[in-house]
């Protein structure tokens, strides 16, 4: 599992930070507002949706009630994976980055079963795991001549599968 918010309430709060609210919220919110307005909804719902400026507000007035939840908090609680990670019985690699603007709180070793491996990197943002390529001049492959190497994530996932005895094609 890569860059998945396991605690939806915490992820929603992280979207209230200045940077997330100014940069990511418009990018993510505008398309879902447009889709919501295309539904058969009342004028009051249209006015409420048009007034939204946070994803959590949208979830409170549209997403949660449309899916049978009392509020955005009820929806977030019900859709969070965190309470279930302690019950996982199959091997699972949960990869996240400390600088991911979407995740908020991530799982700790006390939150997960022994079959869950937590891998939290200092950097990587949201699914942006790269490493500095120190051998860029030695490579004959054009994509490897870049300063940054995008192979960290696939190589890490491959190594994880191999470590638990699952063959993984490179």
PLM ranges: what are they?
Residues 88, 93-96:
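Short beta-strand/loop motif that positions the catalytic acidic residue
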Residues 77-89:
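The feature captures the conserved acid-bearing segment of alpha/beta-hydrolase catalytic domains
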Residues 82, 98-101, 123-125:
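Acidic beta-to-alpha connecting loop that harbors the catalytic carboxylate
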Residues 11-13, 105-107, 129-133:
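Short conserved micro-motifs at the rims of enzyme active sites and ligand-binding pockets
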Residues 1-67:
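Alpha/beta-hydrolase-fold enzymes
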Residues 14-19, 109-111, 134-137:
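Short secondary-structure boundary/capping segments
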Residues 104-117, 121:
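Conserved loop-alpha-helix segment in the C-terminal half of the alpha/beta-hydrolase fold
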Residues 122-170:
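Catalytic active-site module of serine/aspartate enzymes centered on a nucleophile-bearing elbow/loop
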């Amino acid at each position: 599992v890569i860059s998945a918010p396991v605690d939806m309430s915490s992820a929603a709060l992280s979207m209230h930070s200045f940077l997330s609210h100014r940069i990511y919220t418009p990018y993510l919110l505008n398309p879902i507002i447009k889709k919501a307005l295309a539904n058969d909804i009342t004028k009051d719902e249209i006015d409420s949706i048009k007034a939204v400026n946070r994803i959590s507000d949208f979830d409170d007035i549209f997403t949660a009630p449309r899916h049978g939840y009392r509020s955005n908090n009820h929806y977030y609680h019900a859709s969070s994976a965190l309470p279930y990670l302690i019950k996982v019985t199959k091997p699972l690699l949960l990869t996240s980055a400390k600088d991911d603007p979407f995740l908020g709180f991530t799982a700790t070793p006390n939150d997960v079963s022994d079959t869950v491996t937590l891998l939290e990197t200092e950097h990587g943002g949201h699914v942006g795991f790269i490493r500095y390529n120190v051998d860029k001049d030695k490579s004959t492959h054009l994509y490897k001549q870049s300063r940054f190497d995008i192979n960290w994530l696939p190589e890490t996932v491959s190594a994880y599968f191999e470590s638990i005895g699952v063959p993984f094609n490179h």
